[in-house]
Amino acid sequence: MMNDSFGARLRRERERRHITLAQIADTTKIKASLFQGLERDDVSRWPGGIFRRSFVRAYAQAIGLDPEQTCREFVER
């Protein structure tokens, strides 16, 4: 079993659904570069606090994952 990072799992799920980062950015009105960072497990350029959780929820919803579960996994990583 692969021991993927949180970001790598999100990217795999997004690609499996044939959704581009540009599509997510268009849907969420959040820059694609921020989601690229999420998929690389690098959120250093993100605003802090509640915004991070909001971005993760928006990404999850845009690719069809459970937003609350995904957010919990993000916080616990």
Question: Which ranges hold each PLM region?
Answer:
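Cytosolic/nucleoplasmic/matrix-facing N-terminal domains/tails
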Residues: 1-77
